[in-house]
């Protein structure tokens, strides 16, 4: 079965563009959606855009024309709107390619981005429009990778990282962590919890996460 990935580049500073080649090798088909200045960064990295969109208030008119020239489809929005450019891009990607995986670059702002944008991009997990594709969304930066887990059993294959953090966005029931340096028996949490700085074992065995209800984020962290 053919696999597809949509790479969405937001406007955060220094997105992990060096990860794109690895993604291209991993999938049969890769699509590019750029939001505002993120669109320009994709073009400058040498890739053509399937869709360039946003209000383009962070680029010059000349840069806007460059984006337009390298976009198969170009969508301009007013600067005063009830959405962020990044969320518009993700919404479009999930509707146009509903079976794909989604990798969002420049959404975490780990190197100087706005904290309010960071929180908006974490809390998008609660928006109904993103639910269908949430389990296939990865937020990827140079030192962090974030995925969202829904209730059930999940096996996290070993990945080189300093820390593996488990953070709930809601109350959770029956959360267990097995195979990690620090394990957790089935535990209920009545409020969101941050179980950070766990690790894979030296044996590099998978980590198993399970829970009965709630919403959980996994952070792979390569930063002290």
Where are these regions (language model features)?
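Structural motif
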Residues: 9-12, 107-108, 221
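Short phosphate-binding loop-to-helix
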Residues: 74-97
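Histidine-anchored nucleotide/phosphate-binding helix
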Residues: 20, 37-43, 89-90, 118-126
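A glycine-rich helix N-cap at a beta->alpha junction
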Residues: 69-78, 161-168
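N-terminal beta-strand-loop-alpha-helix module at the start
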Residues: 1-66
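Anionic-ligand-binding alpha/beta catalytic cores of soluble enzymes and soluble regulatory domains
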Residues: 101, 105-155
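Long, charged alpha-helical interface segments
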Residues: 142-144, 148-224
């Amino acid at each position: 079965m053919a696999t597809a990935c949509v790479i969405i580049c937001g406007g955060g500073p220094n997105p992990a563009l060096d990860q794109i080649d690895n993604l291209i090798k991993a999938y049969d088909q890769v699509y590019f959606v750029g939001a505002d200045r993120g669109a320009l960064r994709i073009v400058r990295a040498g890739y053509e855009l399937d869709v360039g969109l946003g209000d383009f208030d962070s680029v010059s008119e000349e840069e806007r024309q460059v984006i337009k020239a390298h976009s198969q489809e170009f969508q301009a929005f007013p600067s005063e709107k009830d959405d962020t450019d990044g969320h518009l891009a993700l919404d479009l990607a999930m509707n146009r390619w509903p079976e794909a995986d989604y990798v969002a670059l420049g959404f975490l702002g780990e190197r100087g981005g706005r904290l309010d944008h960071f929180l908006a991009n974490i809390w998008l997990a609660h928006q109904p429009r993103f639910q269908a594709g949430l389990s296939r969304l990865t937020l990827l930066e140079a030192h962090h990778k974030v995925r969202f887990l829904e209730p059930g059993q999940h096996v996290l294959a070993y990945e080189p990282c300093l820390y593996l953090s488990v953070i709930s966005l809601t109350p959770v029931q029956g959360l267990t962590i097995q195979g990690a340096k620090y394990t957790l028996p089935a535990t209920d949490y009545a409020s969101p919890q941050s179980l950070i700085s766990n690790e894979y074992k030296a044996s590099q065995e998978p980590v198993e996460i399970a829970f009965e209800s709630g919403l959980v984020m996994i952070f792979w962290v390569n930063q002290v």
